[in-house]
Design a protein with these regions (language model features):
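Structural signature of the two symmetry-related core transmembrane helices
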Residues: 79-93, 172, 296-311
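Symmetry-related core transmembrane helices of the 12-TM Major Facilitator Superfamily/SLC fold
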Residues: 167-184, 388-404
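Helix-to-loop junctions at the C-terminal end of transmembrane segments
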Residues: 63-76, 159, 281-293, 379-380
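Cytoplasmic helix-loop-helix junction between adjacent transmembrane helices
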Residues: 107-145, 343
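Residue-level signature of mid-helix packing/kink "hotspots" within the transmembrane helices
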Residues: 58-66, 148-149, 275-283, 368-369
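Helix-loop boundary and gating motifs at the non-cytosolic
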Residues: 8-58, 231-270
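C-terminal transmembrane helical hairpin of 12-TM major facilitator-type secondary transporters
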Residues: 295-340
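Juxtamembrane intracellular "pre-TM" segments in multi-pass secondary transporters
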Residues: 1-12, 187-235, 420-422
């Protein structure tokens, strides 16, 4: 333990602020994910309209996550993150003022982007400050999971007590707390030409110009070129498969559980179980990086996670078995996620953390958009049970080429940082 404290990055001498950004940042996004269906239902909107509103938050992150990540690398992660957190704070009181579908959808698109980019900033900042250390990334993920657990409870209770206005004003307060955490967190080094890292005598910021708000094709090309790094390609593929399992859970998994007559409370217990065990598993990620082969651990953990979610129809509807499957899957995902982040962070170098987080967020949003409708189409064509089998088999087949990527990553010494950007 003494050696770990001695080896702690200087920027984490007091890690409370950066861990707090994890708790509040991820919880901030989940706060609105939970709130928008409640608000739309109170306005009498149809299920189709609610579905469109829920999905609208993904629109900007799909196209702009890479651009925002590059801005973080160029102008400072904390600086860019604060802008989007302040944007979300300013938009929160507008929700109760807009009871119409189209204005609400436009607001949801912009606010969803702001929340996503703010959370990306927290992920980028911890990767920069920890230099990709899986143990600290795991602790950050642990606190983030706490945020996702308490946010729905808080907003649900406030909604029951006072409705839309108090709930969205709590969103303002949540954003202000996140602002304080970011202001107390240290800024990381940015690329040459921007502000130097903490401890340098010079305090020069890169000058922001209006044209910097526009995405550049060259930035996207440079970002996608990171996929040429075997470690990045391998971890992006694993991250897509991991999120595909989550896409199954948030779509037809719930449908299946309702078909076997589980109550809403029971389903909630299953969802809480995976969040809790995922948080606990995150604390083991650093040790897993040290005691085993990280690449093989990530692949085997992802394969087992896919098997556990796709085996749902074959558990006989027995609650104990369903619970054990969720506990095991949560633990595996909790261990694997910080390892993925760590391998990526070490592979790309300190000045491209925002870009790789943006690339990862793009893959995340794509899997969230693609998997539920594909699975729904399979269920409509055959059955819900068949959709688990067909999609599960396809996802497992996708793991085969990852073995080749793992071998390439090992051959290219993924622990060595990529050349620094100039």
């Amino acid at each position: 333990m003494t050696n770990r404290v001695a080896d702690r990055p200087a920027a984490l001498a007091n890690p409370v602020a950066i861990y707090t950004t994890g708790l509040l940042g991820m919880g901030y996004a989940d706060f609105y994910i939970f709130l928008i269906p409640l608000y739309a239902l109170s306005l009498g909107m149809s299920a189709g309209e609610i579905g469109v509103l829920a999905g609208a938050r993904h629109l900007l992150p799909v196209f702009l996550s890479i651009h925002v990540g590059v801005l973080m690398d160029r102008f400072g992660t904390r600086r860019v993150s604060l802008f989007f957190v302040w944007l979300a704070i300013s938009l929160a009181p507008m929700f109760p003022l807009l009871p119409w579908f189209w204005p609400l959808m436009l607001l949801q698109i912009v606010n969803g982007g702001a929340l996503s980019f703010g959370w990306s900033g927290s992920q980028t900042l911890i990767a920069q400050l920890t230099e990709g250390d899986a143990e600290y990334l795991g602790r950050f993920n642990f606190f983030a999971r706490i945020g996702t657990t308490i946010a729905p409870i808080v907003v649900g209770g406030v909604w029951d007590l006072g409705g839309a206005w108090p709930a969205y004003l709590i969103g303002v307060a949540w954003g202000m707390l996140l602002t304080l955490a970011l202001l107390r967190a240290p800024e990381a080094q940015i690329a040459p030409g921007g502000r130097p890292g903490v401890g340098h005598s010079e305090r020069r910021w890169a000058r922001f110009q209006l044209r910097d708000t526009l995405p550049r094709v060259s930035d996207y090309i440079a970002c996608f070129s990171l996929v040429a790094i075997p470690a990045v390609a391998m971890t992006l593929a694993l991250f897509f498969l991991r999120n595909a399992g989550n896409g199954i859970q948030f779509s037809l998994y719930v449908v299946y559980l309702k078909q076997i007559n589980l109550t809403g409370t029971t389903i909630g217990v299953l969802f809480s179980a995976i969040e809790i065990t995922s948080a606990l598993g995150s604390l083991f990620a650093g040790r897993a990086m040290r005691i085993g082969d990280p690449q093989r651990t990530m692949l085997s953990g992802t394969v087992l996670s896919i098997l556990l979610i796709c085996a749902t129809p074959f558990l006989g509807g027995v609650f104990v078995l369903l619970l054990l499957a969720q506990v095991a899957r949560g633990w595996l995902q909790g261990v694997v996620q910080p390892m993925i982040f760590s391998v990526q962070a070490k592979a790309v170098g300190r000045y491209r953390q925002g870009a790789v987080v943006g690339l990862r967020q793009t893959m995340n949003r794509l899997s969230s958009i693609l998997i539920p409708p594909i699975m729904g189409a399979i269920a409509d064509w055959w059955s819900v049970t068949a959709s688990f089998v067909v999609l599960g088999g396809f996802l497992l087949l996708m793991c085969i080429p990852i073995v080749r990527l793992i071998r390439r990553a090992a051959a290219s010494a993924i622990a060595e940082e990529a050349p620094e950007a100039t």
